[in-house]
Amino acid sequence: MSETRLIHLVDDDEAVRHSASFMLRHAGFSVKTYADGVIFLESAQQAALGCILLDVQMPHMDGLEVQQRLNALGISLPVIVLTGHGDVEVAVKAMKAGAVDFVEKPYEKQTLIAALTRAFERLEARSHKDVLTDEAKGRIERLTPR
């Protein structure tokens, strides 16, 4: 991806949204913030391609439920789950629901950047695979019956 990598940051804590988006922008990412999962889901189907940083403990709808709804909508952007409650059970549920990584708050900048780098590599590999699949389908459609 040659364009700026976009991160959808979903966290109910304004201080976390502000500090994380500042740090991520300085690291070269583009960041769109959402105050909770409901607000994010309202725009998720039109959301630009990118990765999702998703807090687990939020009012109205927790991060795991947001993940389930994304899956139900067929939205498969890479999700990195953020939590200040780094218990193993939540991590396992998040990973089973399709999260690509799990980062405990407070996190080190390098840890978060490394998780995002892996998530974007996964997204780019999937995008490349989709392009190759589309090209193969096009070739098959152009074949003449024998």
Regions found by a protein language model. Give the residues of each.
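Active-site residues of response regulator receiver
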Residues: 55, 83
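C-terminal output helix
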Residues: 87-89, 103-117
